[in-house]
Design a protein with these regions (language model features):
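Residues forming the flavin
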Residues: 1-300
Length: 300
């Protein structure tokens, strides 16, 4: 219970430990009445009046909130980056796990001295049919770069990006802090090739599009900022009559006045089931969905 936040170490832009947020939410849940938690099962069929679980049990209901979220892009699809092929090519999700364990190390056990972070892996990429922006990757890359510099002050950290999209409160300030306080390097350009070297490092090729110059860089570790992709369960939701966007995310009833409502009365949405969002936005949507459910029940 807790969704994707369980795998995070600290949350941007305040660097609040994810465990603190989860603990506070679980405490509030434990103090609430008339709530039954079912784990180790999933919904196999959803309608406004009945939810069928994988255990075979049917739950009768008057409203349903679907908050099945999103999943992460499989970095192995982008073979040119070497994930699953070369040592020390990891994803942003892998790095969060390392932060949680307190062990950010190379496969040899040594500390990384030079680290590259690549933005937009599986986002804004027509070649892999992921045209959407995953929204939180840029700020995640900045947050992780700062955490790496806090762990290894002498290390060189490079962020390779197409565009830096700092949309939230405190994000732009964190981006500036990464450059001014932590001396994180930002290079505008995508990495075109990754290859191993004879001394067990990684050589990356890219182009600095601001200077128009090709770039070769030897690094100890490459972090791939993987984007959000729609949950595979959305296909079965579409088969049940719910509308799905071309991106694979579910289509809300209205982007402005019904963003937590579906096209079927009595079924509501919350979180990244409809689009990439940060933690705060997902929590706010859950609150909005709860209010909409209350309104719906009071009308019946």
């Amino acid at each position: 219970m807790g969704g994707k936040i369980r795998s995070w170490h600290k949350l941007f832009p305040t660097f609040t430990p994810a465990d603190e947020v989860l603990s506070a939410m679980r405490h509030r849940l434990s103090q609430s009445e008339n709530i039954t938690i079912r784990t180790d099962c999933k919904a196999t069929n959803i309608s406004p009046r009945c939810v069928t679980l994988s255990t075979g049990e049917e739950l009768q209901c008057d409203a349903v909130v679907v908050a099945t979220g999103s999943t992460l892009f499989d970095a192995r699809i982008k073979e040119e980056y070497g994930y699953g092929i070369y040592d020390n090519v990891i994803t942003s999700a892998d790095l969060e796990q390392m932060f949680n364990k307190g062990e950010v190390r190379l496969t040899t056990g040594a500390q990384p001295r030079r680290i590259a972070i690549l933005h937009c892996v599986g986002s804004r990429d027509e070649k892999v049919c992921q045209r959407h922006c995953s929204k939180v990757c840029c700020v995640t890359g900045v947050k992780q770069a700062i955490e790496l510099k806090q762990l290894f002050p002498a290390a060189d950290v490079f962020n390779f990006y197409m565009d830096i999209r700092m949309f939230g409160p405190g994000y732009e300030e964190m981006y500036r802090e990464a450059q001014q306080k932590y001396n994180v390097h930002f290079v505008r350009g995508r990495i075109s090739e990754v290859s191993p070297t004879i001394d067990n490092r990684l050589q990356i090729k890219a182009e600095d599009t601001l200077t128009g110059r090709p770039l070769k860089l030897g690094v100890d570790m490459l972090v791939l900022l993987i984007g959000m992709r729609s949950n595979d369960m959305n296909i079965s939701l579409e088969q049940a009559g719910l509308k799905r966007q071309p991106s694979g995310f579910m289509q809300p009833k209205d982007s402005f006045l019904g963003n937590v409502e579906s096209n079927i009365s009595g079924i509501f949405y919350a979180g990244t089931i409809t689009a990439p969002k940060n933690v705060g936005e997902s929590i706010n949507e859950a609150t909005a969905a709860a209010r909409k459910v209350t309104e719906w029940l009071n009308k019946r």
